């Protein structure tokens, strides 16, 4: 009884077979079929390789939301070289919310040479070239995000020539922590001194002819310092043509959470608008000579996440490629073979001959049958 049930079950399963096997003796091969098969297999191989390269690649997904974090501090990373002696200039941040000077203890003043060495100049040209390409090809920013922490350092390389030359500039570098509100980071003549109504700079002790706010921004970023990330002002160099010259940078900072397969960091992107003018009170151009970076924070936060195609999606796409090519090439081969048979095979010379009367021994004739080779019925 069990054997009978097993046979019935096996017979039922065989009837449900959606892939019946055709014996080889009933299969007819042809040169056209072999050619189409070679084309199909080649196409499948090429598309499979291309699909695998897509599977290996990653892309950046951007999501936007309102920034709800107002209690934390904003970090400003600075590395600027000014073409003046260190005891002539002072740098600080004016917080517009509290109208007070933020602590500048994190900044270091280091005597330096303003002119770059040949190796440093080559580094600067390369950085400026990357900046120009980023202006044209915005998708390169995704490549920079994915290569963070594994690419070469973007810091200015040390000098390789004689370092015994007398320093003629001041390198101001370090970081500051400020409130997450609009502010003004500036470098001007004289050291900053706080007082109840704000702050002031001791500029009276500096000779006016010593003013030279030519500067080079080797690095300026907001948030966590992420090696390998190139910021909009990195590599910028400005040469002052007058002692009373003001350089202004209007910066909009966008909080950014970066999540890749290499790092996870809270950083900030920013856009900048530059302006420079000569201070001339007689002509109505008022102001203070110096370098002013006025920044404001966006209310939106951007989350940048590196994503990868899941394996199940890759498998489904691969099956679609293989099955689609098999079905399409088989259908095209069948249509082509059918057309060729209609045009050529139905009208081959010698396959059929005109119908003629065929006499038989009993005296009747047959006018409907073709005449075969031996004139036999």
From Swiss-Prot:
Q: Is Signal one of the keywords UniProt gives this record?
A: no
Give the protein's recorded name.
Answer: Endoplasmic reticulum-Golgi intermediate compartment protein 2
Classify the source by domain of life: Eukaryota
Query: Which Gene Ontology cellular component terms are annotated?
Result: endoplasmic reticulum membrane; endoplasmic reticulum-Golgi intermediate compartment; endoplasmic reticulum-Golgi intermediate compartment membrane; Golgi apparatus; nucleolus; retrograde transporter complex, Golgi to ER
Q: Where can this protein be found?
A: Endoplasmic reticulum-Golgi intermediate compartment membrane; Golgi apparatus, cis-Golgi network membrane; Endoplasmic reticulum membrane; Cytoplasm
Instruction: Give the organism the record lists.
Output: Mus musculus
> What is its biological role?
Possible role in transport between endoplasmic reticulum and Golgi.
Q: Name one GO biological process term.
A: retrograde vesicle-mediated transport, Golgi to endoplasmic reticulum
- The stretches that face the Cytoplasmic side, renumbered to this chain, are 1-33, 341-377
Note one Pfam family from the annotation. Answer: COPIIcoated_ERV
Hey, which stretches end up on the Lumenal side?
A: 55-319
> What quaternary structure, including any partners, is listed in this protein's UniProt entry?
May form a heteromeric complex composed of ERGIC1, ERGIC2 and ERGIC3. Interacts with ERGIC3, the interaction is required for the stable expression of both proteins. May interact with EEF1A1.
Question: Which InterPro entries does the protein's record reference?
Answer: Erv (IPR045888), Erv_C (IPR012936), Erv_N (IPR039542)
Question: What is the membrane topology noted in the UniProt record heading this document?
Answer: Multi-pass membrane protein
Keywords assigned by UniProt, alphabetized = Cytoplasm, Endoplasmic reticulum, ER-Golgi transport, Golgi apparatus, Membrane, Nucleus, Transmembrane, Transmembrane helix, Transport
Transmembrane parts of this sequence: 34-54, 320-340
Q: Which family does it belong to?
A: Belongs to the ERGIC family.
